[in-house]
Every structure is written in structure tokens, then in C-alpha cells.
């Protein structure tokens, strides 16, 4: 997140991994099979057999409300007075879509709903599509539209519109029921592109008690009127990521899951109103390490993104990290989390603003209503350590998540 502001579970992780698999190649939750029409039959006739449908519709919903309380701007604050129309002190909860909370309760910044469809042409070929609407943008957005072809028991190809797998929770980032927070840590999960149009090759296998998943992917993405840059700049900003190339590898052994990812892309950012036309080379590295011991679990993730604008301009690094631990007490899951984000530039005199640093501590309490829905309450304490982002704030949020 380069900032002219003066700026990633289900009740058990095993269920979470099942959801990952479902999102990768099927729908979230299969709809009930359609029953064959019953023809009149003699009393001794066998009951008609069920005929599974090739078409499935599923969905997810997160109604999230929150507000800032006890917010303040330090005396040496040099950041903006407003972010995306919201007066600061404020809290940026969703960088990718421009979701910002203020001192009045609002459902707009993060609430969203999605519908996913899947059509199976054959046992080896299907199509998956997903449309999402948000409080910040009520226009339906196609986030997935890809064909999945299974080459054999271990290899499959996806071609079309997909999620950039930059983070551990990227494939199901919009499915609030899939994780313990109200929303994934914005210190990591929030950049100017989250999807891409292209192709990926995916491999899965098991070796004894070890499970392996790997993929390579490539493509491009264009975002008109970027929600991310509404936070940073006035007016309309368009974004293009071209020549996206990346790979990820995930290993699971018992309670331990480790994932590594690499991505690179050429990017351009244009805003005619500000005479802005920037080109950069982006590189990203990430590692996630998770532990799940049934009654308690630990989630951690570290990423570093770099943007190089050329030798006559500047380049900067933006490492971000999160670590959290939770305890499962039947239907209740308390979860504590810490996250941090920082920037550093190789030529500070040319960097548009003072590099930003901020950190956040949060406490979440989740209650599982049933196997398809939950409610969560989360309190965040956000510190703007360089006094140039949004101020120091406390935030309270509540959410209702459902899959159907």
C-alpha cells in the first residue's frame, strides 16, 4: 500500500481446508440434488432414483457494521483530514474497496454478498462464476468466471477470471464464515488488484501424512476507478497489472500448514485529474505458518511487496505481518491478533510522502449459530505511529456471516 496518505476459521482448520478445496474447484456448499420427476408406479415398484443436477448455486453474506470511538489526531499529524469522504480520525478497514469507518455507526464500509454458480459439463470440465456486491459499490462485480479442467487425479487447469492467490485467505477472502476475524487484516489484505484474467496450473497430492498443493499462474488485470486509490487520491484513478506471473506452494502435516508465494507484475496507475501516470515493477513474497491443535490454533502471515519506479524516481518496500491465536470453546471462539505495516524508500527525497507505519491489536469473539452462520464482535486498537495515515483510533465492529 503506497500511500499518498501520508500511507490477511471455521470451527476447525480441517473444515477450513475443505472449504479451500471447494472454492478452488467447486462451489462453497453444493445445493441439494434435484429429484427426478416421479411417474405413476404400481405399489410394488421401486422408488425413483435421484438424478444429480449439473448446475449448482451457492452464496455467502456478511453484514458488518462498526464505528470509531476514542479517536484522535496527534498534534504532529500530517495526514489527510478526510479519506474517501470520511472525516479523520478514521479507520481504513478495506483498502481494496475503499471501506473507511468514522465516528458514526455504518454498515457501508465492509458489508457484502455474493452468489456463486457452477455448471458441470462432464466429470472433468466445469465452469465457476461468482458475482459480489458491496456496501461501497452496489454494482455487481464479477470476481470469478473461469473454466476448470481436470487433467488427472493430481493436475487441473483453470482459465478465466480468478482471484490472485497472494495471501493464504485470498481464495475465500470474501467469505466471512471462513475465518475468525470480522475481516482479514487490512495491513496485508488490501492492494489495488485482487483478481486477474488468465490461467493457472494446479497440483495436489498426498505423500503419507503430508499433503501438497502447488500452482503457477499468469495473466493481467485492469481496474477502472480503483477503490484502493479513492483512499489515496482525489478523482478517478485507473490501475493496470500486466504480465502477472506467480507461484505458490502449500504443505500440510498434521496440525502444521506452511504456505509460500511469489508474484511479479508490471503496473501502471493513471489519474488524469492529477496528471498522474506512474509505471512500476511490482514483486511480492509471502509466507504463512498456521498451527491447529483442535481446541486452540495459531494463524500467522508475513508478506513483503516492493515497487520499483525506475532509477530516476524511487523504489520502496512494504513489509506487513500478522499473528493471532484462538481458543475453541464449543460454539465460542475468542481470538486475539496483532498486525503491523511499514514502508521504506530508497530515495526518501523523491518519495511522495513520509513513509507510513502503523500497527493494530484486535480482540474478536465469534459465536457459531449453526453450521452455516456466525456472529462476531471485534474491537481494534489502531496506532498511526508516523502520524500520517488516519490517526489513532479504537474501532468496534459486529458482523453476521452466512453461507448458503
Predicted features by range, described:
Residues 53, 103, 107-113, 139-143, ...:
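Residues that define the transmembrane beta-barrel architecture of outer-membrane proteins
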Residues 56, 62-66, 102-223, 250-254, ...:
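Outer membrane beta-barrel
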Amino acid at each position: 500500500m503506497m500511500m499518498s496518505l501520508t500511507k490477511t476459521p471455521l470451527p476447525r482448520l480441517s473444515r477450513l481446508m475443505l472449504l479451500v478445496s471447494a472454492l478452488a474447484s467447486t462451489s462453497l456448499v453444493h445445493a441439494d440434488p434435484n429429484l427426478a420427476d416421479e411417474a405413476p408406479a404400481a405399489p410394488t415398484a421401486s422408488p425413483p432414483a435421484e438424478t444429480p443436477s449439473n448446475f449448482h448455486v451457492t452464496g455467502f453474506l456478511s453484514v458488518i457494521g462498526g464505528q470509531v470511538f476514542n479517536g484522535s489526531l496527534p498534534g504532529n499529524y500530517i495526514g489527510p483530514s478526510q479519506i474517501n469522504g470520511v472525516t479523520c480520525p478514521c479507520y481504513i478497514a478495506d483498502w481494496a474497496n475503499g471501506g473507511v469507518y468514522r465516528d458514526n455507526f455504518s454498515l457501508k464500509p465492509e458489508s457484502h454478498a455474493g452468489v456463486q454458480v457452477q455448471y458441470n459439463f462432464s466429470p472433468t470440465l466445469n465452469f465457476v462464476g461468482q458475482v459480489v456486491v458491496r456496501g461501497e459499490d452496489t454494482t455487481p462485480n464479477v470476481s470469478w468466471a473461469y473454466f476448470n479442467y481436470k487433467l488427472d487425479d493430481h493436475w487441473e487447469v483453470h482459465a478465466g477470471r480468478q482471484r490472485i492467490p497472494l495471501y493464504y485467505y485470498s481464495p475465500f477472502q470474501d467469505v466471512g464464515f471462513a475465518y475468525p476475524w470480522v475481516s482479514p487484516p487490512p495491513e496485508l489484505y488490501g492492494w489495488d488488484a485482487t483478481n486477474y484474467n488468465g490461467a493457472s496450473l494446479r497440483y495436489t497430492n498426498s505423500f503419507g501424512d503430508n499433503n501438497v498443493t502447488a500452482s503457477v499462474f499468469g495473466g493481467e488485470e485492469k481496474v477502472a476507478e480503483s477503490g484502493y486509490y479513492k483512499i489515496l487520491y482525489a478523482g478517478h484513478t485507473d490501475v493496470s497489472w500486466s504480465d502477472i506471473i506467480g507461484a505458490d506452494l502449500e504443505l500440510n502435516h498434521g496440525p502444521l500448514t506452511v504456505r509460500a508465494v511469489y508474484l511479479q507484475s508490471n503496473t501502471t496507475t493513471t489519474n488524469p485529474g492529477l496528471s498522474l501516470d506512474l509505471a512500476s515493477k511490482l514483486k511480492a513474497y509471502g509466507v504463512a505458518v498456521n498451527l491447529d491443535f483442535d481446541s486452540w490454533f495459531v494463524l500467522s502471515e508475513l508478506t513483503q511487496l516492493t515497487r520499483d519506479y525506475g532509477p530516476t524516481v524511487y523504489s520502496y518496500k512494504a513489509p506487513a505481518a500478522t499473528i493471532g491465536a484462538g481458543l475453541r470453546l464449543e460454539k465460542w471462539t475468542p481470538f486475539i491478533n496483532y498486525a503491523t505495516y511499514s514502508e521504506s524508500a530508497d530515495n526518501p527525497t523523491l518519495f511522495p510522502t513520509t513513509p507510513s507505519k502503523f500497527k493494530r491489536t484486535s480482540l474478536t469473539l465469534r459465536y457459531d449459530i449453526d453450521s452455516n452462520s456466525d456472529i462476531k464482535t471485534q474491537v481494534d486498537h489502531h496506532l498511526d505511529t508516523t502520524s500520517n495515515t488516519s490517526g489513532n483510533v479504537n474501532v468496534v465492529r459486529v458482523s453476521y456471516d452466512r453461507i448458503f
